[in-house]
Every structure is written in C-alpha cells, then in structure tokens.
C-alpha cells in the first residue's frame, strides 16, 4: 500500500473542506502512527491479497504475528466477498469489468496537487447496460460509523477514477460503497456523473484556499 499522502488528501477532505486554513497549520506536525493504524494497514493488505488472488494474480499473503487474527480474517472476508460479488454481477451484463486494486487516483484538476489511493475501483456496466464506476473503501474502525452518502473522500476517489478511466465505458453513474464490518455497515451512495461534476466545481475555490 502506498504511504505517501497529498496535502489535500481525500481521507482528510472533510477537514479541509470545512476548515481550509487547518491544512497549512498542521503541515509541520509529524504523522503519528498507532496500534489501530498499524492494524488497519495490515487488514488492508489482507484485503488486497484476497482480491488479487481472486483475480488470479501471483501474490503472497501478508504476515503479522500481532495482527493476523481470526477477527481480521473475518472482516477482510466480508470486504473481499462484497467486492467479488460486484465484479461477478458486472460480468453478468456481458462486459469484462476493469478492476483496479489499491489504485492511486489523481484529482488535481479539482484540488491542487490532489491524489489518493482508492481501495478498489471497478469500471464496467450496471444492470441496465450503462457505464458505471464503483468505488469501494474498507474501514476497520468500530468507533465511528462512516456513511457513504455524499462522502467527500469517496467522491474525490470517484473523480480521480473518472478522469483516468471513465471514457472506457462511457460512465454515466457513480456508486460508492463503504465496507465497515465491525459495525455491520455496508453503505452505498449512487449518483449520476453530472451531479458528481457539479459538486467538484463547487469545491474548487475551497480547495485552492486550503492549498494556499
């Protein structure tokens, strides 16, 4: 998993969209890791391994004496099974979906120097044969329920995915799903690309303010 972060990262977008000056104020402070962050990183690596294995890629399972627990196995299964079900449903439409695992996406056309890493981008066709991009994000936390509804992190990932690959299936619809197994939360938000682009235009001035 990439560990480089943009100043206007998607994961911190809720903060910089609501308080633009905070980005530069915090720039000099080091990022402090934690046990929870380390566990989350390992769980994401296991998720990546399981999906890549399904895709018949040659991969080695990540190892951790501390974090490789039965619970991690269970919650990563929830994620992998959900993602695989999306891919299989798209295949039923007659298309071969494009699947991008831990994909770096660039949304610098919206937020200066903006980029991030999407856990999963799946591009293909929906149930009606229309172009669709589905963005999935895995959350290991159990303290705060994360809703996909108009989630700025997910919307920025979707914008980056559209900019890079949207033309391949003439994407008309965006779906964004948060998978948070410890809270039994699988939350999905769907919107037309036109709505996503309207939101993107509305946040451009805020992003510039935060960056400067």
Model-derived features with residue positions:
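Metal-dependent nuclease catalytic cores that hydrolyze phosphodiester bonds in DNA/RNA
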Residues: 1-133, 175
């Amino acid at each position: 998993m990439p560990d480089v972060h943009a100043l206007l990262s998607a994961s911190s977008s809720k903060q910089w969209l609501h308080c633009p000056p905070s980005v530069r104020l915090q720039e000099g402070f080091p990022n402090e890791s934690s046990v929870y962050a380390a566990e989350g990183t390992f769980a994401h690596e296991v998720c990546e391994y399981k999906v890549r294995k399904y895709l018949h890629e040659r991969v080695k399972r990540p190892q951790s004496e501390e974090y490789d627990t039965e619970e991690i196995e269970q919650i990563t299964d929830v994620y992998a099974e959900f993602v695989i079900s999306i891919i299989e449903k798209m295949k039923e439409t007659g298309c071969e979906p494009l699947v991008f695992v831990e994909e770096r996406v660039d949304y610098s056309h919206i937020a200066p120097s903006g980029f991030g890493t999407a856990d999963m981008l799946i591009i293909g066709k929906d149930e009606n044969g229309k172009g669709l991009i589905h963005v999935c994000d895995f959350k290991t936390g159990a303290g705060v329920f994360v809703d996909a509804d108009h989630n700025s992190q997910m919307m920025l990932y979707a914008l980056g995915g559209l900019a890079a690959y949207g033309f391949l299936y003439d994407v008309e619809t965006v779906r964004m799903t948060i998978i948070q197994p410890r809270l039994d939360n699988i939350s999905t938000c769907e919107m037309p690309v036109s709505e996503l682009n309207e939101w993107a235009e509305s946040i451009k001035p805020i992003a510039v303010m935060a960056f400067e």
